Design a protein with these regions (language model features):
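Short, charged/polar "capping" segments at the starts of alpha-helices
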Residues: 23-29, 87-90
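Flexible, glycine-/basic-rich loop-and-beta segments that form/coincide
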Residues: 128-140
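Short acidic low-complexity segments
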Residues: 37-48
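Conserved class I S-adenosyl-L-methionine
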Residues: 8-21
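C-terminal substrate-binding/active-site "lid" region of AdoMet-derived donor-dependent transferases
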Residues: 81-123
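A short, conserved alpha-helix within the catalytic core of class I
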Residues: 58-66
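Short glycine-centered segments of the SAM/dcSAM-binding site in methyltransferase folds
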Residues: 15, 76-77
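Helix-to-beta-strand junctions that scaffold the AdoMet/dcAdoMet cofactor pocket
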Residues: 72-74
Length: 140
């Protein structure tokens, strides 16, 4: 799990938001990082440096994006995990290129893709003004 969190740009934050996750994922993280506070719902009074959202459908992206963006620190780390097309466990209307309109409309674009496990991929979103090399790919 530590290697995965390194890939996800986890920088040792003491408190993170992990939304809509399976219990097994929470348990694995809790065992590996026993001094980490994991919020399963956004605390509206807390600004997060690291938010990880599991979304099985576009509806999940639309549900969790507003609250995640509201509580994400300036240039905080925001990941959305979604089912792989090859997953035998999940079927989804999300993929690397589709289902992220609400994030794109808010100025957030997918910049990095990481494999979580056999069922999940994770896509990191970053606000356009913090993306170093845009080369016409993203609107400014």
């Amino acid at each position: 799990m530590k290697n995965l969190f390194e890939k996800l740009n986890y920088k040792g934050n003491k408190r993170i938001a992990l939304l809509n996750s399976e219990d097994r994922f929470i348990n694995d993280i809790s065992i590996e990082f026993n001094d980490l506070t994991i919020d399963r719902e956004i605390d509206p009074r807390f600004p997060y440096d690291f938010i990880l959202v599991f979304a099985k459908k576009i509806a999940d992206v639309e549900k969790y994006t507003p609250v995640a963006l509201h509580n994400l620190l300036c240039d905080g780390v925001l990941w959305f995990c979604y089912p792989k097309k090859s997953s035998k466990k999940f079927k989804s209307d999300l993929d690397r290129d589709h289902g992220w309109k609400i994030l794109n409309d808010s100025g957030y674009y997918g910049i990095r893709l990481v494999s979580i496990d056999e069922d999940w991929s994770a896509l990191r979103f970053r606000y356009v003004k913090f993306i170093k090399s845009v080369s016409g790919r993203f609107p400014r």
